[in-house]
C-alpha cells in the first residue's frame, strides 16, 4: 500500500467514523461507508488539507470511492 493510499484511507475512516479495516479501495463513500452530503464535503476538505491541494467542486463531485480519491491525489499532487 502506498503512502498516499494509506493516508487517504486513514482520513476516510476518521471523517466517516468507519473502521480502517472496512475502508477498501472499491468502497463507495455513500453506499458502503454511510456518508451523507455533508460528510463528503468534510472529507474533501480533509483531503485538501492533508495533501495541500485544492479540489474544485466539479472534480469533488466525481470522487465517490476511496480509489477515486487516491487516484485524484496521485494525479494532482504538486
Curated annotation (Swiss-Prot):
Listed Pfam families: PP-binding (PF00550)
Record keywords: Cytoplasm, Fatty acid biosynthesis, Fatty acid metabolism, Lipid biosynthesis, Lipid metabolism, Phosphopantetheine, Phosphoprotein
Domain Carrier: start-end pairs: 2-77
One function term, GO molecular function aspect: acyl binding
A Gene Ontology cellular-component term: membrane
Major localisation: cytoplasm
An annotated GO BP: lipid A biosynthetic process
Database matches in PANTHER family: ACYL CARRIER PROTEIN, CARRIER DOMAIN-CONTAINING PROTEIN
Record protein name field: Acyl carrier protein
Amino acid at each position: 500500500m502506498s503512502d498516499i493510499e494509506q493516508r487517504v484511507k486513514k482520513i476516510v475512516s476518521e471523517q466517516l467514523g468507519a473502521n480502517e479495516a472496512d475502508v477498501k479501495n472499491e468502497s463507495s463513500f455513500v453506499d458502503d461507508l454511510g456518508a451523507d452530503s455533508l460528510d463528503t464535503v468534510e472529507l474533501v476538505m480533509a483531503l485538501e488539507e492533508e495533501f495541500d491541494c485544492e479540489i474544485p467542486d466539479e472534480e469533488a463531485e466525481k470522487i465517490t470511492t476511496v480509489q477515486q480519491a487516491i487516484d485524484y491525489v496521485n494525479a494532482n499532487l504538486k
